[in-house]
């Protein structure tokens, strides 16, 4: 989208501050303001608009001496709104996953789990959702190569078991899993030596994770963590106790 078009949209938004600007911008772009109702095409429209705003803002700061102050204010205003929409998208995509993951695993392991998004997961870029034991810094589970778009529209995900910055420990755990393959769930592959990614579990869902209701999400994750990964994780957690 061209700079003047974005400035015009920004001026229109600022002209009516009584309504939630994020909703008004979404209505302007896709005809409604529900993140959960975005089609894939509408998601791309919002993403492209926000990327255009970021690029124009960046260029305006480079050319600040020659820019019109009112245009700078307009772009800065709509940039802030677009970043708020980004936060809304991230929460809609990952909020239930993070909450349910923490709730389920904390019931099993006495409230010691943390769940965090890493990277620019709100858009099309690849990030991670890290799932770790608070007292063990060296090992964790991660949803890898994940972003809001495949949370809303995909049905294939990868859950990795990783060891951070400790290749010897990684190899020890890898050797344990190769020696006792019963510890691994189905659809799980062990990665090569010298890598801190130990294993990748391929997760397939009947519908996109972010499209699930809270009840559906709870049921799916409960099965994923407690039935398919529970035995493997429990055995590994016992091993982790020597590596605080």
Positions of predicted regions on the chain:
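Interfaces that engage single-stranded nucleic acids at replication/repair/recombination sites
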Residues: 1-63, 210, 219, 223, ...
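Polyanion-binding interface signature
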Residues: 68-207
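Short, flexible helical or helix-coil boundary motifs
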Residues: 13-17, 33, 50-68, 79, ...
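C-terminal amphipathic "assembly/sorting" segment characterized by alternating charged
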Residues: 187-244
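Intrinsic-disorder/low-complexity, polar/charged segments
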Residues: 18, 34-39, 68-77, 83-87, ...
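Low-complexity, intrinsically disordered/propeptide-like segments
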Residues: 16, 29, 41, 63, ...
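Short amphipathic alpha-helical segments
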Residues: 42, 93, 97-101, 165, ...
